[in-house]
């Protein structure tokens, strides 16, 4: 198996419902996402994937949905709608609390399989950095 990794950076805000500390409040991060893609063999050009294709598919989705958005739990829709109405802020709703763990799992299991559906490779893992020192891997 041969693996290639592409980094994508984006800025987004979120909050964790029922968190007992400061993460219960709206705040933001400079997220760094590392997408690891693998194949059993390279293509006729000697590549697993053209890094530009990862950018075209994954970064485009991130830019349209997550970058400079507010990522909220679907139970936060009332607050999200008020923020969107007042500021025009882009809101992305998740079924779970938008923790780094849940965001990475959502991308790996629900979003990226749809983006890369007709390709000869697969996403093996994602690393999502919430800060330079803290990340999750799924």
From Swiss-Prot:
Biological or metabolic pathway of the protein: Purine metabolism; 7-cyano-7-deazaguanine biosynthesis
Per UniProt, the keywords (alphabetical) are: Lyase, Metal-binding, Queuosine biosynthesis, Zinc
Task: Please state the Enzyme Commission number of this protein.
Answer: 4.1.2.50
Q: How is the co-factor bound, per the entry?
A: Binds 1 zinc ion per subunit.
State the Gene Ontology terms under molecular function. 6-carboxytetrahydropterin synthase activity; metal ion binding
Q: Which residues form the active site?
A: 23, 68, 130
What is the source species? Rickettsia conorii (strain ATCC VR-613 / Malish 7)
**Statement: the UniProt record of this protein carries the keyword Lyase:** yes
Instruction: Note one Pfam family from the annotation.
Output: PTPS
Q: Which family does it belong to?
A: Belongs to the PTPS family. QueD subfamily.
Q: From which domain of life does this come?
A: Bacteria
Identification of the protein by name: 6-carboxy-5,6,7,8-tetrahydropterin synthase
**Which residues are recorded as binding Zn(2+)?**
14, 27, 29
What cofactors are annotated for this protein?
Zn(2+)
The record's function comment reads: Catalyzes the conversion of 7,8-dihydroneopterin triphosphate (H2NTP) to 6-carboxy-5,6,7,8-tetrahydropterin (CPH4) and acetaldehyde.
One GO BP on record is: queuosine biosynthetic process
Question: Top-level EC class, please?
Answer: lyase
Q: Which reaction does it catalyse?
A: 7,8-dihydroneopterin 3'-triphosphate + H2O = 6-carboxy-5,6,7,8-tetrahydropterin + triphosphate + acetaldehyde + 2 H(+)
Extra remark beyond the main annotation? The active site is at the interface between 2 subunits. The proton acceptor Cys is on one subunit, and the charge relay system is on the other subunit.
Q: Which InterPro entries match?
A: 6-PTP_synth/QueD (IPR007115), 6-PTP_synth/QueD_sf (IPR038418)
